[in-house]
Amino acid sequence: RQRQMCIRDSPYRAPKDYRKQALASVTTHDLPPTAGYLNFAHVKLREELHLLSEPVEAFAASAMAERTAMMNRLVENGYISQTVADDVEGHVQEIVEAMHAMLTDTPSLLLQAALVDGVGECRSQNQPGTSREYSNWRVPLADSSGHVVHTDEVFDLPRVQSLAAVMRREKR
Protein backbone atom coordinates (compact mmCIF):
# COMPACT_ATOMS: atom_id res chain seq x y z
CA ARG A 1 0.00 0.00 0.00
CA GLN A 2 2.89 2.36 0.46
CA ARG A 3 3.61 4.72 -2.42
CA GLN A 4 7.16 5.88 -2.90
CA MET A 5 6.12 9.52 -2.44
CA CYS A 6 4.72 8.96 1.03
CA ILE A 7 5.70 8.47 4.61
CA ARG A 8 4.54 5.03 5.70
CA ASP A 9 1.13 5.95 7.11
CA SER A 10 0.68 9.18 5.13
CA PRO A 11 0.38 12.12 4.89
CA TYR A 12 2.41 12.48 1.74
CA ARG A 13 5.68 14.31 2.09
CA ALA A 14 6.06 17.79 0.72
CA PRO A 15 8.67 17.92 -2.07
CA LYS A 16 11.04 20.04 0.07
CA ASP A 17 11.11 17.30 2.74
CA TYR A 18 12.85 14.70 0.58
CA ARG A 19 16.46 13.82 1.22
CA LYS A 20 19.04 15.04 -1.26
CA GLN A 21 21.04 11.79 -1.24
CA ALA A 22 18.11 9.64 -2.36
CA LEU A 23 16.45 8.08 -5.37
CA ALA A 24 12.91 9.44 -5.63
CA SER A 25 10.20 7.75 -7.66
CA VAL A 26 6.44 7.74 -7.96
CA THR A 27 6.23 3.94 -8.19
CA THR A 28 8.44 0.84 -8.33
CA HIS A 29 8.21 -2.64 -9.81
CA ASP A 30 6.57 -3.90 -6.60
CA LEU A 31 3.79 -1.29 -6.73
CA PRO A 32 1.09 -0.85 -9.34
CA PRO A 33 1.73 1.54 -12.21
CA THR A 34 0.48 4.98 -11.23
CA ALA A 35 -2.51 4.76 -13.61
CA GLY A 36 -3.46 1.46 -11.94
CA TYR A 37 -3.04 3.03 -8.52
CA LEU A 38 -5.31 5.92 -9.52
CA ASN A 39 -8.06 3.63 -10.82
CA PHE A 40 -7.68 1.06 -8.02
CA ALA A 41 -6.50 -1.79 -10.27
CA HIS A 42 -4.32 -2.95 -7.36
CA VAL A 43 -7.38 -3.34 -5.13
CA LYS A 44 -9.16 -5.46 -7.74
CA LEU A 45 -6.07 -7.57 -8.41
CA ARG A 46 -5.33 -8.27 -4.75
CA GLU A 47 -8.96 -9.21 -4.19
CA GLU A 48 -8.94 -11.57 -7.20
CA LEU A 49 -5.73 -13.22 -5.98
CA HIS A 50 -7.01 -13.50 -2.38
CA LEU A 51 -4.06 -11.50 -1.04
CA LEU A 52 -5.99 -9.19 1.26
CA SER A 53 -5.62 -9.60 5.01
CA GLU A 54 -8.65 -7.39 5.59
CA PRO A 55 -12.10 -7.14 4.00
CA VAL A 56 -11.95 -5.71 0.48
CA GLU A 57 -14.17 -2.82 1.58
CA ALA A 58 -11.62 -1.76 4.20
CA PHE A 59 -8.72 -2.07 1.74
CA ALA A 60 -10.67 -0.12 -0.89
CA ALA A 61 -11.49 2.60 1.66
CA SER A 62 -7.81 2.84 2.59
CA ALA A 63 -6.83 3.07 -1.09
CA MET A 64 -9.42 5.81 -1.61
CA ALA A 65 -8.09 7.72 1.40
CA GLU A 66 -4.52 7.45 0.04
CA ARG A 67 -5.60 8.68 -3.38
CA THR A 68 -7.56 11.55 -1.82
CA ALA A 69 -4.51 12.52 0.26
CA MET A 70 -2.37 12.57 -2.89
CA MET A 71 -4.95 14.64 -4.81
CA ASN A 72 -5.06 17.09 -1.89
CA ARG A 73 -1.25 17.37 -1.88
CA LEU A 74 -1.22 17.99 -5.65
CA VAL A 75 -3.95 20.65 -5.39
CA GLU A 76 -2.38 22.36 -2.34
CA ASN A 77 0.94 22.65 -4.15
CA GLY A 78 -0.55 23.87 -7.43
CA TYR A 79 0.22 20.82 -9.57
CA ILE A 80 -3.44 20.22 -10.49
CA SER A 81 -6.73 22.06 -10.06
CA GLN A 82 -9.50 20.93 -7.75
CA THR A 83 -11.57 20.20 -10.87
CA VAL A 84 -8.94 17.68 -12.01
CA ALA A 85 -8.74 16.16 -8.52
CA ASP A 86 -12.51 15.72 -8.50
CA ASP A 87 -12.41 13.78 -11.80
CA VAL A 88 -9.41 11.46 -11.46
CA GLU A 89 -10.65 8.96 -14.04
CA GLY A 90 -10.97 11.70 -16.65
CA HIS A 91 -7.48 13.10 -16.02
CA VAL A 92 -5.21 10.13 -15.35
CA GLN A 93 -2.35 11.22 -17.62
CA GLU A 94 -2.45 14.77 -16.26
CA ILE A 95 -2.32 13.47 -12.69
CA VAL A 96 0.49 11.00 -13.44
CA GLU A 97 2.48 13.88 -14.92
CA ALA A 98 1.64 16.12 -11.95
CA MET A 99 2.94 13.48 -9.55
CA HIS A 100 6.17 13.35 -11.53
CA ALA A 101 6.36 17.16 -11.63
CA MET A 102 6.13 17.15 -7.86
CA LEU A 103 8.97 14.63 -7.83
CA THR A 104 11.15 17.01 -9.86
CA ASP A 105 10.67 19.64 -7.16
CA THR A 106 12.37 17.47 -4.55
CA PRO A 107 16.04 18.02 -3.72
CA SER A 108 16.72 14.33 -4.48
CA LEU A 109 19.68 13.94 -6.81
CA LEU A 110 18.27 10.86 -8.54
CA LEU A 111 14.78 10.71 -10.01
CA GLN A 112 13.11 7.74 -11.65
CA ALA A 113 10.15 7.55 -13.99
CA ALA A 114 8.77 4.08 -14.64
CA LEU A 115 8.23 3.01 -18.23
CA VAL A 116 4.76 1.78 -17.28
CA ASP A 117 3.88 5.35 -16.28
CA GLY A 118 5.18 6.65 -19.59
CA VAL A 119 2.95 4.41 -21.69
CA GLY A 120 -0.11 4.52 -19.41
CA GLU A 121 -0.07 0.87 -18.35
CA CYS A 122 -2.48 -0.04 -15.54
CA ARG A 123 -1.47 -3.65 -14.89
CA SER A 124 1.18 -4.54 -12.35
CA GLN A 125 4.33 -6.12 -13.74
CA ASN A 126 4.97 -7.88 -10.43
CA GLN A 127 2.67 -8.77 -7.56
CA PRO A 128 4.60 -9.44 -4.34
CA GLY A 129 3.37 -12.46 -2.44
CA THR A 130 2.70 -14.49 -5.57
CA SER A 131 4.64 -16.97 -7.65
CA ARG A 132 2.18 -18.99 -9.71
CA GLU A 133 -0.95 -16.99 -8.94
CA TYR A 134 0.11 -14.06 -11.13
CA SER A 135 2.17 -13.80 -14.31
CA ASN A 136 4.98 -11.81 -12.68
CA TRP A 137 7.41 -10.32 -15.20
CA ARG A 138 5.43 -11.80 -18.10
CA VAL A 139 2.81 -9.07 -18.46
CA PRO A 140 3.29 -7.53 -21.92
CA LEU A 141 3.78 -3.77 -21.75
CA ALA A 142 0.60 -2.06 -22.96
CA ASP A 143 -0.68 1.48 -23.29
CA SER A 144 -3.73 2.96 -21.59
CA SER A 145 -5.98 1.33 -24.21
CA GLY A 146 -4.50 -2.11 -23.60
CA HIS A 147 -2.58 -2.23 -26.89
CA VAL A 148 0.82 -3.90 -26.66
CA VAL A 149 3.73 -1.46 -26.87
CA HIS A 150 6.87 -2.77 -28.55
CA THR A 151 10.28 -1.56 -27.42
CA ASP A 152 11.13 -0.07 -30.80
CA GLU A 153 8.13 2.28 -30.60
CA VAL A 154 8.25 3.35 -26.95
CA PHE A 155 10.06 6.63 -27.44
CA ASP A 156 7.84 7.65 -30.35
CA LEU A 157 4.74 7.65 -28.15
CA PRO A 158 3.44 11.16 -27.35
CA ARG A 159 2.63 10.09 -23.80
CA VAL A 160 6.22 8.94 -23.18
CA GLN A 161 7.58 12.14 -24.69
CA SER A 162 5.24 14.20 -22.52
CA LEU A 163 6.35 12.48 -19.31
CA ALA A 164 10.00 12.84 -20.35
CA ALA A 165 9.42 16.59 -20.79
CA VAL A 166 8.02 16.72 -17.25
CA MET A 167 11.06 14.90 -15.90
CA ARG A 168 13.32 17.36 -17.74
CA ARG A 169 11.26 20.19 -16.19
CA GLU A 170 10.24 21.43 -19.63
CA LYS A 171 6.53 21.04 -18.97
CA ARG A 172 4.50 22.45 -16.08
Task: Pin down the residues of each PLM region.
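A glycine-rich beta-turn/hairpin centered on an aromatic-Pro dipeptide
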Residues: 56-113, 119
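Hydrophobic faces of well-ordered beta-strands that scaffold small-molecule active sites
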Residues: 1, 24-27, 111-113
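A structural signal for the main folded, soluble domain(s) of proteins
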Residues: 1, 125-130, 144, 166-171
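Conserved, mostly hydrophobic/aromatic
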Residues: 29, 137
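Short, small-residue-biased leader/transition segments that mark boundaries at the very start
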Residues: 2-7
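Short, solvent-exposed loop/turn segments at secondary-structure junctions
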Residues: 8, 30-32, 116-120, 146-147
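Short conserved micro-motifs at the rims of enzyme active sites and ligand-binding pockets
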Residues: 10-14, 34-45, 49, 122-126, ...
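Non-catalytic regulatory appendages
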Residues: 16-19
